[in-house]
Each structure stands twice: as C-alpha cells, then as structure tokens.
Amino acid sequence: MAMAVFRREGRRLLPSIAARPIAAIRSPLSSDQEEGLLGVRSISTQVVRNRMKSVKNIQKITKAMKMVAASKLRAVQGRAENSRGLWQPFTALLGDNPSIDVKKSVVVTLSSDKGLCGGINSTVVKVSRALYKLNAGPEKEVQFVIVGEKAKAIMFRDSKNDIVLSVTELNKNPLNYAQVSVLADDILKNVEFDALRIVYNKFHSVVAFLPTVSTVLSPEIIEKESEIGGKLGELDSYEIEGGETKGEILQNLAEFQFSCVMFNAVLENACSEMGARMSAMDSSSRNAGEMLDRLTLTYNRTRQASITTELIEIISGASALEAAK
C-alpha cells in the first residue's frame, strides 16, 4: 500500500521535476574563446589565409632551391663530361671486371651530404647491400667505405661493424682532382683489398641517372690475372723500359686508375644529386601551386558563405522590424 502511494506521488512530482530550469553553468573558456567558437566562419577564413601564406613561402623556397641546383649543375656537368677521358684509357688497359671472384672486397658507396634530392642515396645503398650479399662468404670478407652523410646514416644502422672508413662534407668546396686524389690515397693506405667496387649514380639527364659499379683491382690480382691470360694477359706484350719492375708499374697504374675513377664517380654523383634536386624542387613548386589554387578556392567559398550569412541576417532583422510595425 505504501509503495503504491509512493509511486503515485512520484508520477505527480515527475512533470514538475522535468520542467525545472537547468542552472546556468559558467563556461571555462574566456570571452574571446567563446566568441571564436561561435564565429566558426571567421576563424576558418583566417586559418585558410594563414595556410595560403605558408604555402606561398614554401613555394618561394623550392623555386630558389631549384635555381641554385640548376646553377651548380651547369658548373659541374662540363667537368664531369671531361673527366670521363681520364679513366677510360685505364679501363681499356686494365679492364673492369665486376664479376671477378676475390677474397677481400671493399665497396665504396658515394652519396650526398644533403637531402631533398629524390632517391639517389637510397639507390646506391641498395646496390651496395646487394654487392655485399653477392661477395660475402665463409672465406670472403666484404667491407664498406662510405662517402656522404646520407649513406652513412643509413648504413650505420645495420652494417656499422663492416664500415672501415667514412668521409663527409666532400662537396663542401668545389671538387678538384687534388682533393679526390687525397681521398683515394687515404683509402688505399687504410684499407686492404683485392677489389674496390665503387658505387655511384652516373648522370644522364636532369631526370635520369643510372646506378653504376666500377671495379678497380689490386696490383697483385692484376698480375695474377695477367699470368692466367684473358684480357689482362695482353699486359705481358708491353715492353717495360727503365728500372721499374712489372709489380711497381702495376702498383702505380692501379693507384692512378683508382684516383681517376673516383674523380669521375664523385663528379657524376654530384651531377645526379643536383639534377635530382632540380626535379624534386620543380615537382614541389608545382604541388605548392596546385595546393594554393585549392586553398584560394576554399577561401573564396568560405568568404562567400560568410557574406551570404551576414546578408541573410540583415534581411531577416529588417523583415522582423517591418513586421513589428
């Protein structure tokens, strides 16, 4: 009986409870923030305008970087083409034997110190790792010489113990043969090898570069191969004049061949870097232009919607005043 009375009283009180006004709760936001939340269109317009300004600044930077890369490419390209005449006679004389089987191989990986140049650095790293797998074995040793900050950063992750020498900031100053020959001399003094395999990007055009491997054999391997015969067997047909022995002559030829091949490889890789950076910056500039067009369209639509809303509010207010009269 008591429960029935309680239920009746509850039903009688329920409408009055539901109709009670909800107490006002002060917002934790400041007046400016509340104003901003209510004015969504004005905020979105400002955000789009700021975004457009950022994209314009980025587009200016990418265009400037493209022009700088084009200027550097013109300066290096002619020297790279001229340097091809240095190593070609040595390749004709001593050969280029990428498939030769030796016990000690050293892979010289050439990369850039700076980024924003497409996939030239990842490409030479992939080729270097493939050479490591091909030449590694139970009685074989493969080591790395890294030239450039980008390849160094990638190779240090999983091949740190196999890196015997790393060189950075080679392109800080204009490249010349004396600078590269000092680098080649350091490699020859600090690294024991039977074959040096130089991995670099050969320049073809602004949008095309070819990963290339050039092989330089040690004097001992050259002499051994010349005794066996084949292409290197033709070395015995040359008459040696002066007091130098065949081993000393081969030593000098191998060292000079390595420095010439390195000089050409460094210049070819520098051309590929500048060409790839030109292409990347041109693509970035075009993408920024397309993004700017979309943002301009969004800004105009948002602004038009805001103006339309304000006009509707003005007309509605005027109509209400007319009706009140």
Curated annotation (Swiss-Prot):
Recorded hits in Pfam families, A to Z, give:
ATP-synt
For this entry, the transit peptide stretch runs 1-42
Q: Hey, which family's this protein in?
A: Belongs to the ATPase gamma chain family.
Quaternary context = F-type ATPases have 2 components, CF(1) - the catalytic core - and CF(0) - the membrane proton channel. CF(1) has five subunits: alpha(3), beta(3), gamma(1), delta(1), epsilon(1). CF(0) has three main subunits: a, b and c.
Is this entry keyworded Cell wall biogenesis/degradation?
no
Compartment(s): Mitochondrion; Mitochondrion inner membrane
Residues making up the signal peptide according to the UniProt record: none
Q: What is its main location?
A: mitochondrion
Question: What species was this sequence derived from?
Answer: Arabidopsis thaliana
State what this protein does.
Mitochondrial membrane ATP synthase (F(1)F(0) ATP synthase or Complex V) produces ATP from ADP in the presence of a proton gradient across the membrane which is generated by electron transport complexes of the respiratory chain. F-type ATPases consist of two structural domains, F(1) - containing the extramembraneous catalytic core, and F(0) - containing the membrane proton channel, linked together by a central stalk and a peripheral stalk. During catalysis, ATP synthesis in the catalytic domain of F(1) is coupled via a rotary mechanism of the central stalk subunits to proton translocation.
Alphabetical list of InterPro entries matching this protein: ATP_synth_F1_ATPase_gsu (IPR035968), ATP_synth_F1_gsu (IPR000131), ATP_synth_F1_gsu_CS (IPR023632)
What is the name of the protein in this document? ATP synthase subunit gamma, mitochondrial
Keywords from the UniProt entry: ATP synthesis, CF(1), Hydrogen ion transport, Ion transport, Membrane, Mitochondrion, Mitochondrion inner membrane, Transit peptide, Transport
GO molecular function (one): zinc ion binding
Gene3D superfamilies with a match to the protein in the record: 3.40.1380.10, ATP synthase, gamma subunit, helix hairpin domain
| Bilayer topology | Peripheral membrane protein
Task: Identify the CDD domains for this entry.
Answer: F1-ATPase_gamma (cd12151)
